[in-house]
């Protein structure tokens, strides 16, 4: 059975036809006065270019995002569908973007060969899911119900904490009030935002006045939510918008220590489309349990 995977920019993966991996863009829009310039996240704008723009942006410049259109999904599926028996689609978490709905519309047109997953995950979690699906397919006969159940179990074992100090994108996107933003900046708080694959929703859950305190709160939260009796951590990752190697290494090592060296922590750059909303100097810590 020839199978391809179709993802979008939030996966931070690059298209690789030899690996049967295809990528659709999500969009970043830079608005300067009345002028707008649109970029394809991960295609013609990378994280370094975006963060440089955000750092040097004059007052009044805004950055926003836009979804993949129904037509784009349809055209991409049409372009590869004859080469495969099945295309597995993993779009951005439906709780974060309505892009998922466009994928589902197209799925109905190719329902025998296009299966869109309700994964409710983002970033490197998508790469982990693809890897695990490949193993599952080697040991199980494909069925929609079977794969959906596998994905449901996968996402219920995933969680993350996002650490934010630059509140401007959150205010611009209507996710944070100006008053709360002022308080956070005045007291130099680290804002903690939780993400659980169980729901796929982002929620403000705490704040801390130091990075170390924020990291401890994050690990305590993830352990409480994800660790069950006789269950261990399986994978962990640090996703960062920062390019200071030493700083990232210190943050990563602190998480390794807080987890008592229970799991290796990989390091990756955050996708540009997510950074548009989290701002500069933001980072995230992701966990998956067994």
UniProtKB/Swiss-Prot annotation:
This chain's protein is named DegV domain-containing protein MG450
Asked whether the keyword Metal-binding is assigned, the reply is: no
InterPro entries for this protein: DegV, DegV_C, DegV_domain_contain
Domain DegV, which positions? 3-289
Record key words, sorted:
Lipid-binding
Q: What does this protein do?
A: May bind long-chain fatty acids, such as palmitate, and may play a role in lipid transport or fatty acid metabolism.
A Pfam entry, by short name:
DegV
Recorded superkingdom? Bacteria
Q: Which organism is it from?
A: Mycoplasma genitalium (strain ATCC 33530 / DSM 19775 / NCTC 10195 / G37) (Mycoplasmoides genitalium)
What changes when the gene is disrupted? Probably essential, it was not disrupted in a global transposon mutagenesis study.
Give a GO molecular function annotation for the protein. Answer: lipid binding
> Could you say which residues bind hexadecanoate here?
65, 97
Q: What PANTHER family would the database entry show?
A: DEGV DOMAIN-CONTAINING PROTEIN DR_1986-RELATED (PTHR33434), FATTY ACID-BINDING PROTEIN TM_1468 (PTHR33434:SF2)
């Amino acid at each position: 059975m020839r199978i391809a995977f179709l993802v979008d920019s939030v996966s931070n993966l690059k298209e690789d036809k030899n690996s049967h991996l295809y990528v659709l863009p999500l969009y970043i829009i830079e608005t300067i006065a009345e002028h707008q310039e649109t970029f394809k996240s991960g295609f013609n704008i990378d994280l370094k270019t975006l963060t440089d723009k955000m750092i040097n942006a004059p007052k009044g410049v805004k950055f926003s995002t836009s979804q993949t259109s129904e037509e784009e999904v349809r055209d991409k599926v049409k372009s590869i569908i004859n080469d495969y028996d099945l295309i597995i689609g993993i779009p951005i978490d439906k709780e974060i973007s309505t892009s998922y709905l466009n994928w589902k519309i197209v799925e109905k047109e190719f329902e025998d060969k296009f299966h869109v997953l309700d994964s409710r995950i983002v970033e490197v979690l998508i790469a982990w899911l693809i890897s695990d699906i490949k193993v599952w397919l080697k040991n199980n006969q494909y069925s929609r119900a079977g794969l959906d159940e596998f994905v449901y179990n996968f996402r219920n074992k995933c969680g993350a904490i996002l650490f934010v100090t630059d509140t401007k994108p959150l205010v611009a996107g209507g996710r944070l009030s100006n008053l709360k933003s002022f308080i956070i900046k005045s007291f130099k708080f680290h804002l903690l935002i939780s993400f659980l694959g169980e729901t796929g929703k982002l929620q403000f859950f705490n704040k801390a006045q130091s990075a170390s305190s924020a990291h401890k709160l994050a690990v305590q939260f993830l352990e409480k939510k994800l660790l069950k009796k006789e269950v261990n951590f399986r994978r962990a990752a640090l996703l960062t918008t920062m390019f200071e190697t030493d700083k990232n290494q210190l943050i990563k090592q602190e998480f390794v220590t807080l987890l008592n060296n229970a799991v290796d922590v990989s390091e990756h750059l955050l996708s540009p489309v997510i950074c548009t909303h989290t701002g500069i100097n933001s980072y995230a810590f992701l966990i998956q349990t067994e």
